[in-house]
Every structure is written in structure tokens, then in C-alpha cells.
Amino acid sequence: MDESDLYRKWMRLVENLEREGIIKSEKVKRAFLRVPRYKFVSDRYKEYAHVDEPLPIPAGQTISAPHMVAIMLELAELEGGMNVLEVGAGSGWNAALIYELVKREVYTIERVSDLVEFARKNLERAGYKDKVHVIWGDGSKGYPPNAPYDRIIVTAGAPKVPEPLIEQLKVGGKLLIPVGSYHLWQELLEVIKLDEDNNTKIKNHGGVAFVPLIGEHGWRE
């Protein structure tokens, strides 16, 4: 399947997500059209990139289903110039979408070294080499060198909200994170930092299924 066929199928998926009310804003739609998922999966999975399901990536991990990525990006309410940290680089796809929404360098942190390399290669091929920085480290600790953040988006499920992530938010900043069980079921939480004492307001957006967040402030291996 050549790239024009892949892109036509991708456009149809984006239109379906918009019709279903999952993609709500023109800016998220525009980002999805600029950053098709097939550029961030292995060759054997490119023909399935338009299917609204998770797909395998290296190290036993997955690239999220497009509808889940769209839901989180809409909830994030990203604006131009925002400082954003992503926890869990995976394939690099979500970080590239974030860049398209904020038009500012994005930092994404990943603990699995094979995925660090996978994401970096994908981002370089897609034209984001100097726009998205993939850091190797424990994402449950955040990334203090570039804090404070307007938004932190976590793409793995935690047992509880990691305190370092709240500490690294700006007052008024937002954290999106799945919290719940180790496997298969969490609740997507929207956490707003209210003050410098790290008081928060939390909204529950319902059930989701993500791989576990492994780290000092996440799950143990």
C-alpha cells in the first residue's frame, strides 16, 4: 500500500472521529491530519494504522487507539506556546501531535531504552527531530529541568497520582493521567493545580485501559 492510499484511509478515520464527536476542535483535527499514525508504527503495521485500535510497538508496548489520543488532546486544551511534558514517549506519535498544537519544543520522557530509540527515529523521519526531545528516564518523577509545565500528559496507568508531577505543574496547570489497576482498567483523571501548596481539583473522565506506569512513583517492575 503506497503512502497516498495510507493517507486517504487516515483521512477517513479522522473524519469519522469528528463525526462521532470525539474530535471536537478544528485544531485537534488539523494536528491529526498533519501527523498520521502510520508514520509512527513498524512497516508491518502501517496498513492497519487507520484502524481505531491500539497497535503493537517494540518492547511489548502499544501505540494508543486514535480515539483515545484525541480524547486526551481535547481534554488537555492545548494552546500555542504552552510548556508540555509527556510521560511515556512510546512511538513518538502523541508528542508530535502535541507539538503541532503548541508549536513549542515538547519534552517526552520514556523509561524503555528501545522505545527511546524507536521514538527518536520516528520523530526524525517525520520532521520533528529538533521539535520533540525524547528523554530516557523515570517518567513518574517528571522532568524537573524543563519545569514548571502548563500541561503534563501521562500515557500509562499509575496506582495513584505521582506527587512530583503535581509539583512540576504551574499553578492553574493541568495533569491528565490514568489511575487504577496495573492491568487493563484505570480511570482518566484531570488534575488541576490550585496553588503552590499543591492542592488540586480532580475530575474523573471515566474508564480507560493503558499499559502500567513503571517507576519510583508508579508501579514496581
Swiss-Prot record:
Group of enzyme by EC: transferase
E.C. numbers: 2.1.1.77
Superkingdom of the organism of origin: Archaea
Keywords annotated in UniProt: Cytoplasm, Methyltransferase, S-adenosyl-L-methionine, Transferase
Biological process, per Gene Ontology: methylation; protein modification process; protein repair
Location of this chain's protein in the cell: Cytoplasm
Residues of the active site: S64
GO cellular component annotations of the record: cytoplasm
GO MF, one example: protein-L-isoaspartate (D-aspartate) O-methyltransferase activity
Pfam families assigned: PCMT
Keyword S-adenosyl-L-methionine: yes
Main location as per UniProt: cytoplasm
Catalytic activity, reaction form: [protein]-L-isoaspartate + S-adenosyl-L-methionine = [protein]-L-isoaspartate alpha-methyl ester + S-adenosyl-L-homocysteine
InterPro entries registered for this protein in UniProt: PCMT, SAM-dependent_MTases_sf
Similarity comment: family membership: Belongs to the methyltransferase superfamily. L-isoaspartyl/D-aspartyl protein methyltransferase family.
Record HAMAP family: PIMT
Function: Catalyzes the methyl esterification of L-isoaspartyl residues in peptides and proteins that result from spontaneous decomposition of normal L-aspartyl and L-asparaginyl residues. It plays a role in the repair and/or degradation of damaged proteins.
Name the record gives this protein: Protein-L-isoaspartate O-methyltransferase
Organism: Thermococcus sibiricus (strain DSM 12597 / MM 739)
Gene name linked to the record: pcm
